[in-house]
Amino acid sequence: MEHIQTRTTLSQLSTLPSDKRLGAIRFKCLLVMKVEMINRIAGVFARRGYNIESLAVGLNKDKALFTIVVSGTERVLQQVMEQLQKLVNVIKVEDLSKEPQVERELMLIKISADPKYRAEVMWLVDVFRAKIVDISDQSLTIEVTGDPGKMVAVQRNLSKFGIREIARTGKIALRREKMGESAPFWRFSAASYPDLEGAMSAGTISRTIKRTPNGESMSMAEGDVYPVETDDNSGVSQVLDAHWGVLNDEDTSGLRSHTLSMLVNDTPGVLNIVTGVFARRGYNIQSLAVGHAEVEGLSRITTVVPGTDESVSKLVQQLYKLVDIHEVRDITHLPFAERELMLIKIAVNAAARRNVLDIASIFRAKAVDVSDHTITLELTGDLHKMVRLQRLLEPYGICEVARTDVWHWYVNQVWIRSTCEDIHTLCSLKSSNLRKIPALCGMCANVDD
């Protein structure tokens, strides 16, 4: 689903008529995911000269939920919505700009941190309710979630230490519920993740029969944003699956998911050009996240595509030929951390609210909006963490889910290796006993936060 929000200044409101006010509008768009769909969506904006400020794509099998922020006048952006709705595979487009909403994005920021300033940095991290996710002798990597205003404040306060690198996901948002009103109820299912479907119990599946807004019953297999396919796809590679491409020792095909990090100019049409390179070569984009970089005028694109090492190497060479590309890195075989941001709205009354909050505290999720019939939670982590929380919340009824794509972050390899060695020495653990999330070194895997 694609979603865009309007932001206008007082000066613009006083000098421009209503149809010519400039602002950033957020669309919510649900579509059937095909190889070329991201390129077609970006092309609608590029042909009209609009620069995409933020893009978040939550993929799941053949469906995708888009959240895009662009700037323009209200009249023209209304025309853009109509053009998006005409695309064959677009199911629904919705503008939530004028609705009260919970808006969040995820930012990873790497700063220079001399040991004598560490105490001050840690104090700022605590003030902004951020987390340290990576550390070395001369740098710290900080994870922070919040609205755009909070992101600006974090950057301003940390800039004096020296910002080395910034990675930001696209913005996601959910509508705030009003007291006394009934929430839209879609009952999203965590079982729609194909590699985790087997763990669903019969009782849980029986509870996922839902009704559409028209009152018609809809089985879970018909799906919404995160559908469950009833077809037997065993033995078939699902290239949109989040964990497709992880090679086993006996896998000789060479296919795997490759993570590419690109630094590009922040100008209209760049995303369309970049995704066009993938589309022309038949690459399906498993994951895509776009956000502002640490340097003004530049954006960072992180994408995941399936392929062999050789074919992706040729793809990187083609990307380097683009004028607006400053840097392309394949970080698949490098140590990196991954994070995803999710907003999830649960239908719950006052009697069950305590139970939901207890579950949220276990997963370190935060309540960001509460009404008399819903709770909206914010959660960061990896895919399995998201799925486990959704499974526990399904019996209460899940109204809406908004997700960023998985954001991959290159970490300090020297520190990770030394830390892993310490863990093995002190705890006498074997690498096979450690929880496996994307590997950070040859000895073991990253530990879930």
UniProtKB/Swiss-Prot annotation:
Q: Does the keyword Plastid apply?
A: yes
* PROSITE patterns assigned: ACT
Q: Where in the cell is it found?
A: Plastid, Chloroplast
Q: What keywords are assigned to this protein?
A: Amino-acid biosynthesis, Branched-chain amino acid biosynthesis, Chloroplast, Plastid, Repeat, Transit peptide
Pathway as given in its UniProt record: Amino-acid biosynthesis; L-isoleucine biosynthesis; L-isoleucine from 2-oxobutanoate: step 1/4; Amino-acid biosynthesis; L-valine biosynthesis; L-valine from pyruvate: step 1/4
Report the protein's function. Regulatory subunit of acetohydroxy-acid synthase. Probably involved in feedback inhibition by branched-chain amino acids. Not involved in herbicide tolerance.
| Stated name of the protein | Acetolactate synthase small subunit 1, chloroplastic
Which organism is this entry from? Nicotiana plumbaginifolia (Leadwort-leaved tobacco)
